[in-house]
């Protein structure tokens, strides 16, 4: 009989972003497959939804880029890894990845990373900081675009002993099955968001950040009205600005400029 595999995922905050929901979904999937499933994070909105009888959560300041806190995290991650007999450590962000990498060296565990975005690097120091995501035994790219980006920008950190694979992001379609959402809850949301049953609804989910394309989305809505005379719709931008107040104000200003406040 094969020994049970214990997997530890480490992420700065367990919020509503793509990396975070991926971590959440995988944690519960692992538990369903009779694997030991563990998460280390500092905080996050999704924590209250974690099924504690299936997934064990530890709170550590893994969101911090402070070198002293990173060293602190190395020590405590090493203890967690040993005490819980962790086999695989999966880091989903750069700051905690440094702690995970060194903790895995100490405990001789398998280190895995997921490269979630095109991290900025304006200097060699920043590029070195980003390179931690490629110091694992396996680096996962979430798309062909990210895969090509890694090969193009970080080729010097790749070698035959390090695996780079594309694993596309999936979703749990049960979340979006209308049958799983009560009529009462549906009506409550419609009332809170002032949604009409008689209008075509367009939803754009995602963090409010310029490269997600919310500005283009708003401009496209204006084109629907001005060029195609399509007016019977309502649109929703759903996501956190994560402190990007200037960008949020820019979007609101754009909505007003195109007279879309009632849309």
What are these regions (language model features)?
Residues 68-75, 110-112, 117-136, 148-157:
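Nucleotide-sugar donor phosphate/pyrophosphate-binding loop at the beta->alpha transition
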Residues 177-195, 250-253:
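A short helix/loop element that forms part of the nucleotide-sugar donor recognition site in Leloir-type
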């Amino acid at each position: 009989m094969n020994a049970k595999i214990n997997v530890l995922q480490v992420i700065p905050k367990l919020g509503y972003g793509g990396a975070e929901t991926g971590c959440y979904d995988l944690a519960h999937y692992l538990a369903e497959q009779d694997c030991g499933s563990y998460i280390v994070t500092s905080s996050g909105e999704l924590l209250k939804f974690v099924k504690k009888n299936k997934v064990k959560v530890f709170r550590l300041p893994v969101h911090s880029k402070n070198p002293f806190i990173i060293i602190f995290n190395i020590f405590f991650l090493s203890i967690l890894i040993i005490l819980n007999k962790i086999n695989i450590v999966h880091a989903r962000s750069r700051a905690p990845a440094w702690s995970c990498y060194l903790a895995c060296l100490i405990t001789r565990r398998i280190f895995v990373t997921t490269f979630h975005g095109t991290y900025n690097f304006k200097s060699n120091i920043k590029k070195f900081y980003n390179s931690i995501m490629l110091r694992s035994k396996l680096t996962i790219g979430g798309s062909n675009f990210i895969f090509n980006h890694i090969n193009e920008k970080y080729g010097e950190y790749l070698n035959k002993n390090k695996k780079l694979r594309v694993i596309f992001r999936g979703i749990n379609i049960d979340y979006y099955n209308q049958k799983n959402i009560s009529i009462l809850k549906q009506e409550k949301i419609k009332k809170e968001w002032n949604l009409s049953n008689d209008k075509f609804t367009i939803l754009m989910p995602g963090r409010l950040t310029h490269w997600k394309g919310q500005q283009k989305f708003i401009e496209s809505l204006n084109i629907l009205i001005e060029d195609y005379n399509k007016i019977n719709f309502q649109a929703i931008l759903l996501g956190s600005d994560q402190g990007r107040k200037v960008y949020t104000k820019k979007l609101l200003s754009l909505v007003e400029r195109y007279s879309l406040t009632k849309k």
